[in-house]
Amino acid sequence: MARKTPIERYRNIGISAHIDAGKTTTTERILFYTGVNHKLGETHDGSATMDWMEQEQERGITITSAATTAFWRGMAGNYPEYRINIIDTPGHVDFTIEVERSMRVLDGACMVYCAVGGVQPQSETVWRQANKYGVPRLAFVNKMDRTGANFFKVYDQLKTRLRANPVPIVIPIGAEDSFTGVVDLVKMKAIIWDEASQGTKFEYGDIPAELEGTANEWREKLVEAAAESSEELMNKYLETGSLDEDDINVALRQRTIAGEIQPMLCGTAFKNKGVQRMLDAVIDYLPSPADIPPVDGQDDDGNPIKRSADDAEKFSALAFKLMSDPFVGQLTFVRVYSGVLKSGDTVYNPIKGKKERIGRLLQMHANNREEIKEVLAGDIAAVVGLKDVTTGETLCDIDSHILLERMEFPEPVISQAVEPKSKADQEKMGLALSRLAQEDPSFRVRSDEESGQTIISGMGELHLEILVDRMRREFGVEANVGKPQVAYRETIRKNCDEVEGKFVKQSGGRGQYGHVVLKLEPLPPGGGYEFVDAIKGGVVPREYIPAVDKGIQETLPAGILAGYPVVDVKATLFFGSYHDVDSNENAFKMAASMAFKEGMRRASPVLLEPMMAVEVETPEDYAGTVMGDLSSRRGMVQGMDDIVGGGKTIKAEVPLAEMFGYATNLRSLTQGRATYTMEFKHYAEAPKNVADEVIAARGK
């Protein structure tokens, strides 16, 4: 089937922002102007289309990144039809995994900022993730109609806080109540939207006299930014003192895709102004799948290979999101990087080493769906009925294997015990938890061997609260949840140069004989676990060496101090012995486990606790109280910045163990006027008194 839309006219974009910058409203307006939605959805009355889980509509925050396809012909109807796939991303810090997951499959992003709040903590996290995946982006300053709105203040913050290189394409006409439209610096005309038509109609006019000086100054900066794209343009600019509209757009596009600049726009999504011009900027400056480099992967032998965004190439795709849908069951969202995927095809999953048959294919529009026959290179769609695919896995051509780079998912930092309320709930709970864990790789489920309890782990209190809530709503499971527990870790501080483990049972008949000598060394933070085989002269036969590694790995989940997982340790096997008849894999596994435990005891074992980066925005009157409170929680205050328009931002590093219930506490300290965000930073050694308490509590 021929393409309806050439690949050059595809845009895969994310709308990304801090929790209250108005991102969902912005996305809603995009859907409205692109003709998909005929009634505007508002987050605060719970009718927003993208926020399609019940809880999101109740809480007014976006949790899952729903993928939606929309079409756009330009605000003046002067473009051929473009196809825009929009991934809505959550703005709450507990859901950064969702942001990261969507960044991986996007080609470009619109970063939404509040004209009053500017660059907020989550904006910095999202910016870092976009840098990590090299995503070209543009900035949209929303809420220009709000009291305290200041476009140029946000411009300064983008430069200082994010080290961005924003290039305004428009500047606002007025602000707060008097915000009426924008000056388009490319066309050097004013754009005024018609309120009666909800912003679908607009007029170009002359630039207001009082803005001419400002407009000329910013136009000059815009043209200079364009001229810097090539020597040829720079010479043209120096000779003529100006550049025409086409030159400017081509040059800005080139520099945006290269990540050198970020076009910057503004408006108020709620009042239907400015989003239309932003959509034109998406088309003008953000890349199509054909503009980005081919995707990297490996063949079956681990050799690097690439696939281009071309229908004629062999099929490859990344499953980036799983969702349970009340009507069709399990949905797997895929981004097709190369080739074509048709319903009925059989594809290969190289991570599981299994074939999968593709059932129905759906193009999603927030919460309704259109069945399609095929998905072409560069497109995003949902597949129904995949049995064994987890988030972050590759699907590829059955005869031409490629393994795309896997996504990295952070380790959970908080755990809770969860118990079904009744026998009936017990059976359903297992299924519900495994389904949720499949959808969300930052959510883990395990069974505590000692207590027999089911332990769930995630990225924060809100994350777990929402998952327990989903269990109740979607799977009908009523459960009691225990107090949140911190995910401690154990490691060593010193080397243990030689430790022996011997597992011998020889009492007639077939015995057991395993003997190993290990050296243990601490690794730098984040080093995980490393095993080195340094056996000389076959004192431990080749076939038993994997068993030694496995024996140690099976010991890692439960350390010797308090039974927490062991991290950042390097184990070197350098000596041992064996018995011709009695040695076997199991004996070497046992010997390795014994040696490792003893080695840990001798190598100054310590308890590690998760440290959180906490950022509190508070009125100035309460800054001292907030800092004192953070210090009392063993926090290290790392700095304090002024918030433009009053107030302070306090940055601190605080152990997670001290942060439970902080939201309630902060509210009472500041009469509800402060807000905070918190994200995992790193693990650090717990002070002795804290470690002793934790170890004693685990020993009970």
UniProtKB/Swiss-Prot annotation:
Q: Which SMART domains match?
A: EFG_C (SM00838), EFG_IV (SM00889)
Positions of GTP binding: 17-24, 88-92, 142-145
Pinpoint the tr-type G domain residues.
Answer: 8-290
Q: Enumerate the Pfam families for this protein.
A: EFG_C, EFG_III, EFG_IV, GTP_EFTU, GTP_EFTU_D2
Q: Which GO terms describe its cellular component?
A: cytoplasm
Q: Which GO terms describe its biological process?
A: ribosome disassembly
Q: Which locations, inside or outside the cell, does it occupy?
A: Cytoplasm
Q: Which domain of life is it from?
A: Bacteria
Keywords on this record? Answer: Cytoplasm, Elongation factor, GTP-binding, Nucleotide-binding, Protein biosynthesis
What InterPro entries does the record point to?
EFG_II, EFG_III, EFG_III/V, EFG_IV, EFG_V, EFG_V-like, EFTu-like_2, G_TR_CS
Q: Which GO terms describe its molecular function?
A: GTP binding; GTPase activity; guanosine tetraphosphate binding; translation elongation factor activity
- PANTHER family for this protein: RIBOSOME-RELEASING FACTOR 2, MITOCHONDRIAL, TRANSLATION ELONGATION FACTOR G-RELATED
Instruction: Report the family membership.
Output: Belongs to the TRAFAC class translation factor GTPase superfamily. Classic translation factor GTPase family. EF-G/EF-2 subfamily.
Q: What does it do?
A: Catalyzes the GTP-dependent ribosomal translocation step during translation elongation. During this step, the ribosome changes from the pre-translocational (PRE) to the post-translocational (POST) state as the newly formed A-site-bound peptidyl-tRNA and P-site-bound deacylated tRNA move to the P and E sites, respectively. Catalyzes the coordinated movement of the two tRNA molecules, the mRNA and conformational changes in the ribosome.
Return the protein name: Elongation factor G 1
Gene it is expressed from: fusA1
